[in-house]
Amino acid sequence: MPQPLKQSLDQSKWLREAEKHLRELENLVDSNLEEEKLKPQLSMGEDVQSPGKGEPLHPNVRAPLSHVVRAATIDLPRLGNKLPAKHHLGKLSGLYQMKGCTFNPEWKVPDISDTHFDLQVLNECPSRNWKYLTPAKFWPKSISYFPVQAGVKAKYPDNVMQHESIVGKYLTRLYEAGILYKRISKHLVTFKGQPYKWEHQYLVKQHQIPDGATTRKINGRAENRRRGDPAKSISRPHDPKRGCNMVRQISNNRSSIRPCANNGGDKHSPTTRRLACWGGKASRINQSYSSRDSSAPVDARGRSESAGSLSSLSGRKAAGNHHHSTLINPSVETTARGRSTPGEQISARDTSALPESRASRACNKDSSIKEENVWYLRGNTSWPNRITGKLFLVDKNSRNTTEARLVVDFSQFSKGKNAMRFPRYWSPNLSTLRRILPVGMPRISLDLSQAFYHLPLNPASSSRLAVSDGQRVYYFRKAPMGVGLSPFLLHLFTTALGSEIARRFNVWTFTYMDDFLLCHPNARHLNSISHAVCTFLQELGIRINFDKTTPSPVTEIRFLGYQIDQKFMKIEEDRWKELRTVIKKIKVGAWYDWKCIQRFVGHLNFVLPFTKGNLEMLKPMYAAITNKVNFSFSSAYRTLLYKLTMGVCKLAIKPKSSVPLPRVATDATPTHGAISHITGGSAVFAFSKVRDIHIQELLMVCLAKLMIKPRCILTDSTFVCHKRYQTLPWHFAMLAKQLLSPMQLYFVPSKYNPADGPSRHKPPDWTALTYTPLSKAIYIPHRLCGT
């Protein structure tokens, strides 16, 4: 082929070949442009292509990719209807056809330690992020509440009781680790561990009163908010006829005190009995008992306390009546910080109505429940006796089926009428990661243990995140994993730590969620730095998962699912093999359900940057997913997908960005197109028909790429420069994307475009040239720009 750089190129064989390529490109456009401009060329009928005779298991991939792409534009895949179709594609299945979870009655609750980071971190790691984290706040616009009995999802219908029992143990473990509040009453919760400074103002302090009764001093005030009189205890002498000692307590609540032994929605039926009360009148009291509540610290409305030897009664005059109605609270209150409060004791005459275990404990005057390191908190909110999220258990992972993982479903805050718009945060894509990673440095990765449980919540926000095991209600004191706000908070948390680590230890640091990546040119220095970093974080109360931490500097590391060595990034070979196996099992002409296709596209998207393909090649499957219809693979389309997985490539870290000087320019009018070279050569072509100007411009740029193969091209079409061709026919868009992806396109105003003259039958003008790239610069955080 003669070089297209001379004045006489319009008379050469090159021009005739260019005309041939132009007609082929125009045929690709015209085959579907008139009918559907916005949809790919896919038949929606019943003419399902049958598999060819002797269809090979391994598709023929010896042909170049460009030939395979053109074959796929002729033998098109098909969209179908919404009738039932195949739900399995190799080892993949539709999202609603996933293998159900298997219940394991021997599940163990994993060890969960108290993750309480020291607020000294605000001084050690100065950052504006801490104002969003100490404490974090969660304010949904609207909330849907569910009954306590629905706290555990019916994931395992044959093992409901066992499932709830293990969930209860899991929540108890979280409570003991200081991650959950436990509901005592509408205004009172309890928690374990060390309180944060913003919780101190809501802590409830208990003081012993000489006569044996107990009152509570809240924020330094021991007075009744409603009546204004000081809290006091009035005891009546023992009456042998009644067999009970009545103790009157002042209530700080606006409403009468109700029994809270059933706090959290006990599933047992309430026991009704009559007791003799003040004034010789009988009042009917409904009390609920359960084996769980008998040993748990309970407070009625957070104000009435157990008092002395027998049941404490709160007596109030009822409006319009001449007798006193009394409500009985059988709750047992334990004290904070090891301080004991006399427990409730019930006379032998009344214990017959209680369960045997409860009666035996209640009759024991010497037994008092003591819990260490327990704090009572009356938050600046009410604590609802209902839940906002549901729970269930699954295996911890595919390799560890002996331990359980708690799944928290707060999906009401991310979809439906209560959906919230959570803040966006910077997350590196593959292109960014390639540009920020340093080349040729040893690396160490650190992993936070229980990362989300480092993030404390405001007590008022905790009341919006209520869960239950079916009996008791708990609230998340730390950020749960099932809320869309938690990843944003974790990003702020690790970013603040990473910035300080990079500054203090003079090491390149990158953080993503709970992963830290440290790089330094000297391996021995990096090894010592990693130990110092771990010590620094642990002194601040931040826990490191040493099982997932690199013990010493390495040259090849797995980070964010990629294999990263000193110069390149790649994907593990096992992942390629699995994907090729799935493609081999595609049956040409068979209908596949769109949910199954959705999973398949997810796997292809991850590996696509490491191939010579582009996203336009997957658009037919995206069309099936968008329209929720079945999909059928053609033989050529299956070959194309297999060809992509065979052309595996590694991506260079820190790719050299070159800005080549433009030597070729293109321009188009509705009827003519032109290509101009900086040496003065030019060629003018006549289109077969009039089309939209942006299509004519793209045709000329593709033709210039095919015939001249320049490193960059000048064009005055912003549509072409941005390389977003979704509105074009699928096969033409795929070919254009394939041709133009690896090269630079510069925008030049029409008045300065050298090819503007030849398209209007005038000589080209390269004297005054002004151009600019329109590609958006990749955002990189400032602290990572210097590497």
Curated annotation (Swiss-Prot):
Annotated region Polymerase/reverse transcriptase domain (RT): the residues are: 366-654
Q: Where is the composition biased (Low complexity)?
A: 305-318
Q: Where is this site: Priming of reverse-transcription by covalently linking the first nucleotide of the (-)DNA?
A: 96
Q: Where is the Reverse transcriptase domain?
A: 375-564
Q: Which Enzyme Commission number(s) are on file for it?
A: 2.7.7.7, 2.7.7.49, 3.1.26.4
Assigned keywords, A-Z: DNA replication, DNA-binding, DNA-directed DNA polymerase, Endonuclease, Hydrolase, Magnesium, Metal-binding, Multifunctional enzyme, Nuclease, Nucleotidyltransferase, RNA-directed DNA polymerase, Transferase
Q: Where is this region: Terminal protein domain (TP)?
A: 1-200
Q: Name one GO molecular function term.
A: metal ion binding
Map out region (Spacer) in residue numbers: 201-365
Q: Per the record, where are the segments of Basic and acidic residues compositional bias?
A: 220-242
Residues covered by region (Disordered): 28-60, 210-274, 286-365
The entry's Mg(2+)-binding residues are 447, 514-515
Reaction(s) the record says it catalyses: DNA(n) + a 2'-deoxyribonucleoside 5'-triphosphate = DNA(n+1) + diphosphate; Endonucleolytic cleavage to 5'-phosphomonoester
Annotated GO biological processes are: DNA replication
Write down the Pfam families for this protein, in alphabetical order.
DNA_pol_viral_C, DNA_pol_viral_N, RVT_1
Q: How is its activity regulated?
A: Activated by host HSP70 and HSP40 in vitro to be able to bind the epsilon loop of the pgRNA. Because deletion of the RNase H region renders the protein partly chaperone-independent, the chaperones may be needed indirectly to relieve occlusion of the RNA-binding site by this domain.
Its job = Multifunctional enzyme that converts the viral RNA genome into dsDNA in viral cytoplasmic capsids. This enzyme displays a DNA polymerase activity that can copy either DNA or RNA templates, and a ribonuclease H (RNase H) activity that cleaves the RNA strand of RNA-DNA heteroduplexes in a partially processive 3'- to 5'-endonucleasic mode. Neo-synthesized pregenomic RNA (pgRNA) are encapsidated together with the P protein, and reverse-transcribed inside the nucleocapsid.
Free-text note on domains in this protein's UniProt record:
Terminal protein domain (TP) is hepadnavirus-specific. Spacer domain is highly variable and separates the TP and RT domains. Polymerase/reverse-transcriptase domain (RT) and ribonuclease H domain (RH) are similar to retrovirus reverse transcriptase/RNase H. The polymerase/reverse transcriptase (RT) and ribonuclease H (RH) domains are structured in five subdomains: finger, palm, thumb, connection and RNase H. Within the palm subdomain, the 'primer grip' region is thought to be involved in the positioning of the primer terminus for accommodating the incoming nucleotide. The RH domain stabilizes the association of RT with primer-template.
What family classification does the UniProt entry report for this protein?
Belongs to the hepadnaviridae P protein family.
Its name, as the record gives it, is Protein P
What organism does the UniProt record list as the source? Duck hepatitis B virus (strain China)
